[in-house]
């Protein structure tokens, strides 16, 4: 139905609008929570738990204002052991920006490393320049406060997200080096 969802971390997936309607794909990945961010975001499947954010794919659209709510929604879903799909229309810009902000908050990675990891999991990932600037602004501004808030709010973090992301980056780098040597 859609292009297929991509697993970024355990119980965290990226996809597009069509993927968010694909019950078979959602069930296969134990997805019970959907974070929908696009112009006309609204709940579609009754059996899902939704966070819907109306936002345009425009460099001037402020996504930072939605980071805390999005991060909490994703984290709560994962803590329950339930999958969370984050999607916009194409699964390229808005949804990727929210997932990068989440990764930055649950790890020590900056926005560029977090985005590089997401691109490995979902090669079409490409936030518009305005969203990239907002991620950079988040990194130099509120990120540390968000990390502290997450620790205070949810106490223990049972995930190995930092290790998972660094392994993903290392694996991709090793594969790239091997490919260069073979050519």
Curated annotation (Swiss-Prot):
<feature type="domain" description="Tyrosine-protein phosphatase">
    <location>
        <begin position="4"/>
        <end position="144"/>
    </location>
</feature>
<dbReference type="GO" id="GO:0004722">
    <property type="term" value="F:protein serine/threonine phosphatase activity"/>
</dbReference>
<dbReference type="InterPro" id="IPR000387">
    <property type="entry name" value="Tyr_Pase_dom"/>
</dbReference>
<keyword id="KW-0378">Hydrolase</keyword>
<dbReference type="GO" id="GO:0005634">
    <property type="term" value="C:nucleus"/>
</dbReference>
<feature type="active site" description="Phosphocysteine intermediate">
    <location>
        <position position="88"/>
    </location>
</feature>
<keyword id="KW-0963">Cytoplasm</keyword>
<dbReference type="GO" id="GO:0004725">
    <property type="term" value="F:protein tyrosine phosphatase activity"/>
</dbReference>
<dbReference type="InterPro" id="IPR020422">
    <property type="entry name" value="TYR_PHOSPHATASE_DUAL_dom"/>
</dbReference>
<keyword id="KW-0904">Protein phosphatase</keyword>
<dbReference type="GO" id="GO:0005829">
    <property type="term" value="C:cytosol"/>
</dbReference>
<comment type="similarity">
    <text>Belongs to the protein-tyrosine phosphatase family. Non-receptor class dual specificity subfamily.</text>
</comment>
<dbReference type="GO" id="GO:0007165">
    <property type="term" value="P:signal transduction"/>
</dbReference>
<keyword id="KW-0539">Nucleus</keyword>
<comment type="function">
    <text>Activates the Jnk signaling pathway. Dephosphorylates and deactivates p38 and stress-activated protein kinase/c-Jun N-terminal kinase (SAPK/JNK).</text>
</comment>
<dbReference type="InterPro" id="IPR000340">
    <property type="entry name" value="Dual-sp_phosphatase_cat-dom"/>
</dbReference>
<protein>
    <recommendedName>
        <fullName>Dual specificity protein phosphatase 22-B</fullName>
        <ecNumber>3.1.3.16</ecNumber>
        <ecNumber>3.1.3.48</ecNumber>
    </recommendedName>
</protein>
<dbReference type="InterPro" id="IPR029021">
    <property type="entry name" value="Prot-tyrosine_phosphatase-like"/>
</dbReference>
<dbReference type="Pfam" id="PF00782">
    <property type="entry name" value="DSPc"/>
</dbReference>
């Amino acid at each position: 139905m859609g292009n297929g969802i991509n697993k970024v971390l355990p119980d965290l997936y990226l996809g597009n609008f069509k993927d968010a309607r694909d019950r078979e794909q959602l069930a296969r990945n134990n997805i019970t929570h959907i974070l929908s961010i696009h112009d006309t975001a609204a709940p579609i499947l009754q059996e899902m738990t939704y966070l819907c954010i109306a936002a345009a794919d425009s460099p001037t659209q402020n996504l930072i204002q939605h980071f805390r709510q999005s991060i909490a929604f994703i984290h709560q879903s994962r803590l329950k052991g339930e999958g969370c799909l984050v999607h916009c229309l194409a699964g390229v810009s808005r949804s990727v920006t929210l997932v990068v902000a989440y990764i930055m908050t649950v790890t020590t990675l900056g926005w560029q490393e977090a985005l590089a990891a997401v691109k490995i999991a979902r090669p079409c990932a490409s936030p518009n320049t305005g969203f990239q600037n907002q991620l950079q602004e988040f990194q130099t501004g509120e990120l540390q406060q968000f990390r502290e808030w997450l620790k205070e709010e949810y106490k223990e973090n049972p995930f190995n997200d930092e290790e998972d992301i660094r392994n993903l980056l290392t694996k991709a780098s090793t594969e790239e080096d091997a490919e260069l040597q073979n050519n």
